[in-house]
Each structure stands twice: as structure tokens, then as C-alpha cells.
Amino acid sequence: MHEAVLLDTSFFLRFLNDSDPLFNNADGYFRYFLQREITMMVSTISIAEYCVGGDVAELPLKNLQIVPFNLDHSKRTGEFAKIVFQNKGKLKLRERNIIPNDTKLFAQADCEKAVEFYLSSDKESEKIYNLLKRQTALKFQFMDLNIPYNEMFGVLDL
């Protein structure tokens, strides 16, 4: 039984926009997590990012566990950011701040004991995850929202 998933901002941008090409995937994951009683978590960092263009009241907060950024997360973020900075030239990232969000969210996913998965459609973020996975032991798996939930979990979509 899976315990929890940390959902990033890109998930909510797709899930809350039924005209987005990834809406059906996001909706499928959301329903799957509810049905399987997999705890859905959202970081206060992702909430802040979402609020740049949306309103916190739009988020399905009654179905989410909010994860505040804490001291343990900050220490792990520093470790992750050091790895990313040392390999920055190899990543071929588009213009992007490394510490502000990707490494913070990954640190939260890694520190929170229940988190098994991190769900995102952000390909640049996935590059950073793959680098960290090669350099350190991460305890969570990156799930690409472009892959439907039934393919990810190997279940029939009936």
C-alpha cells in the first residue's frame, strides 16, 4: 500500500484547468489517490507558487495535507542544492533558479517519511531529480504527469 504523494504546482495548474492537455491525467491521478486512500500532500511552497496566478480557495484543500517548509527540509535543501550547483553545466536547464523551488520540494519529499512519490509535469524539474538520484539516495520516486495513472501503476482504466 502506498502511503503519500507530494503534488507540485504543475499538477494543480493542470488539474484545475479542464482545457489543459494534461487535465485528464491529473484528474485520473487525483481520483486514483482518493480511491486508494493515498495521502495527497502539498507544500506551502507550491501553494505560494499557485497563488501567483490563482487563489488558494481554488485548491482542493479538504483532500490535501499541507506540508510547511521546516528546518529539516532546509538542511536537506542545502545538500541537494550543492549537488545541483556542482553539476549545473551538465543539466542543460532552461533559465531557472535552482534553490528556490525544485530542491526545496525534493527535500520535503525526501524528509517526509510517508512520501513515496512526487508528481509533476515539469520536465526541467525531472532533470534535477535524475541528477540527485544519481548522486544521492532519494527515498521517493518522480512520477511524470504525462504518463497516465493506469500506466504508472499498472492498472486497468475501467
Protein language model regions, located:
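Short, well-structured N-terminal submotif of metal-dependent ribonuclease cores
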Residues: 1-41, 51-62, 146-158
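Acidic, PIN/NYN-like endoribonuclease modules and their adjacent C-terminal/linker elements
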Residues: 2, 112-158
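Short, flexible helix/strand-to-coil boundary loops that buttress conserved ligand/catalytic motifs
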Residues: 16, 54, 81, 129-132
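Short, flexible loop segments at the rims of nucleotide/cofactor-binding pockets, characterized by
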Residues: 17-20, 45, 94-98
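Short, hydrophobic beta-strand segments that form beta-sheet elements in well-ordered domains
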Residues: 41-43, 50, 117-120
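Short, surface-exposed acidic-centric catalytic microdomains
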Residues: 46-57, 71-74
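Active-site regions of enzymes building and remodeling cell-envelope glycoconjugates
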Residues: 59-68, 134-139
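Active-site neighborhoods of divalent-metal-dependent phosphate/nucleic-acid chemistry enzymes
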Residues: 67-127
